């Protein structure tokens, strides 16, 4: 039982249990330039087109393109109108709820087409989905420009919904693309950056959009974002090759003998260890030229049909780990993001009386909180590596979970202090509110990073579908709350809303305790289920 994790006493290979720190029993495995970190997953030995074998600069450029476009197409559109929600209701002559629905319907589209994007990515690769998303995101912005210039709510709503078509692929596939590009020990910081695009950058967008709306008018927001859309589209075409790869299954072995450093009485670990099989009997495949990598499609990556793949997505809901990530990441992020629907409603009235620009500057707190939360990735790597060393070089995916404690502390600090602040209104109370919003942002980003890494480590082959489910739940919640949260806040008060957020958040984070203890048992159980039952064997 390594550090409270219940062991299953089974020698069969298991994803998420790996030799990560070199010892004598792993001496045949490639490492990182002589350092004692073993490469997980093992790269191809006969195909230089494996993304894991790309030059470092090429992988970093691909990641930078993912990161930039995640901001431009996924993070930017939603909060763009948040600071001016209250003011736009008067400008367009519609209720505040209808202004919130400009974002709500957009996010409903994102969630609704998520399964289709997932199966198309599995079948034809991620690049076609990214290209489609970049094109539709740009077209949606153009339609929003037309609608805003005409003060036409319906045209503006249509543009926002088309922007939603351009959001789905970036929000749902970027995290699994990180798993395509990087080894296990390289993912922490990059995963934290990807989480930050959804928790941190919306805040800086709100800050900038509030100031721009106050100075230049709300129509300028869409005009200013169009050049960034075009740059993102060009970057997708020329800098983001296909990251999906059909890697030949490595030859696996289970380790029946204890590593030499282990004590005689130690329990025998179950390991997923890759041996190099020596020189391959097949000739090495030719490296693709740059022009070949620009092709919109590069073939198919599975022999399954679209309907078959579509039906498989929801099978993953039988996995307790999937339910867990939906709770500690999907729901928590949704609660934080929908708070943007009501902040303008809170601060635009006495005793605060903030204007549109000042409503935007309120998000400075959450921006700083999200920025500081990028340490969650390296911290998660450090804790996992430390526990791995103490565990005789054997990595368990559950070593990602302990930093959830930090998330729980800051989430509680943020929401419950925010509750007290709005229940005791003062003219400068928005300053404490900004701090609370930042603390909540930090507290939510940490568990989201840890949960994302846990899924990439434990269920790498199913990560695309799992992140799609997470994205669907999150965006359906966004839409659902947009239909009633403004009226709920007006009736029961913002303090009641934030108290509810705090209680729900702590209850959901508490599920990390059984996941840490029984996570390995669950991984073994799901591995057995995948092997035994046909429907699960198909998704595995």
Task: Describe each model-derived feature in a short phrase.
Residues 74-75, 104-107, 111, 118, ...:
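C-terminal transmembrane bundle
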Residues 1-77, 90:
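Cytosolic juxtamembrane N-terminal segment immediately preceding the first transmembrane helix
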Residues 159-198:
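Cytoplasmic helix-loop-helix junction between adjacent transmembrane helices
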Residues 2-11, 15-17, 50-57, 187, ...:
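Central mid-sequence intracellular linker of multi-pass
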């Amino acid at each position: 039982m390594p550090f409270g994790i219940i062991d299953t006493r089974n020698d069969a290979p298991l994803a998420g249990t790996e030799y990560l720190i070199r010892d004598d029993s792993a001496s045949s495995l490639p490492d990182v330039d002589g350092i004692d970190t073993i490469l997980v997953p093992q790269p191809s030995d006969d195909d230089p087109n494996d993304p894991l074998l790309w030059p470092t600069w090429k992988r970093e450029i691909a990641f930078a393109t993912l990161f930039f476009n995640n901001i431009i197409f996924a993070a930017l559109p939603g909060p763009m109108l948040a600071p001016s929600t209250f003011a736009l209701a008067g400008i367009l002559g519609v209720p505040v709820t209808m202004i919130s629905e400009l974002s709500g319907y957009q996010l409903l589209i994102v969630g609704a087409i998520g399964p289709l994007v997932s199966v198309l990515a599995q079948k034809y690769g991620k690049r076609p989905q990214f290209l489609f998303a970049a094109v539709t995101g740009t077209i949606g912005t153009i339609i929003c420009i037309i609608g805003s210039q005409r003060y036409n709510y319906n045209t503006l709503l249509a543009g926002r919904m088309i922007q939603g078509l351009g959001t789905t692929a970036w929000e749902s596939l970027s995290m699994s693309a990180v798993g395509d590009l990087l080894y296990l020990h390289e993912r922490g910081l990059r995963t934290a950056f990807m989480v930050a695009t959804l928790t941190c950058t919306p805040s800086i967008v709100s800050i900038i959009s509030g100031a721009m709306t106050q100075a230049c008018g709300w129509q300028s927001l869409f005009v200013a974002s169009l050049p960034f859309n075009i740059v993102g589209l060009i970057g997708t075409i020329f800098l983001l090759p296909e990251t999906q790869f059909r890697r030949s299954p490595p030859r696996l072995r289970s380790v029946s003998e204890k590593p030499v450093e282990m004590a005689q009485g130690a329990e025998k670990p179950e390991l997923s260890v890759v041996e190099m099989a020596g020189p391959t009997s097949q000739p090495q495949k030719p490296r693709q030229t740059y022009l070949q990598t620009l092709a919109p499609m590069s073939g198919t990556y599975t022999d399954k049909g679209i309907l078959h793949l579509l039906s498989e997505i929801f099978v993953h809901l039988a996995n307790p780990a999937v339910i867990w990530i939906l709770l500690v990441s999907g729901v928590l992020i949704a609660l934080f993001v929908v708070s943007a629907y009501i902040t303008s409603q809170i601060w635009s009235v006495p005793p605060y009386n903030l204007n549109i620009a000042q409503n935007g500057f309120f998000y400075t707190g959450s921006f700083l909180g999200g920025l500081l939360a990028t340490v969650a990735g390296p911290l998660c790597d450090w804790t996992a590596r430390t526990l791995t060393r103490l565990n005789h070089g054997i990595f368990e995916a559950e070593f990602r979970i302990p930093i959830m404690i930090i998330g729980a502390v800051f989430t509680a600090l943020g929401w419950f202090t925010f509750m007290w602040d709005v229940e005791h209104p003062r003219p400068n109370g928005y300053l404490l509110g900004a701090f609370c919003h930042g603390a909540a942002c930090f507290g939510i980003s940490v568990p989201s990073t840890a949960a994302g890494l846990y899924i990439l480590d434990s269920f790498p082959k199913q990560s695309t579908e799992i992140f799609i489910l997470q994205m669907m739940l999150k965006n359906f919640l966004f839409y659902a709350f947009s239909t009633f949260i403004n009226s709920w806040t007006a009736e029961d008060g913002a303090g009641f809303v934030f108290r509810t957020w705090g209680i729900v958040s702590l209850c959901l984070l508490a599920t990390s305790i059984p996941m840490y203890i029984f996570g390995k048992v669950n991984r073994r159980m799901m591995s057995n289920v995948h092997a035994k039952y046909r429907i699960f064997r198909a998704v595995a």
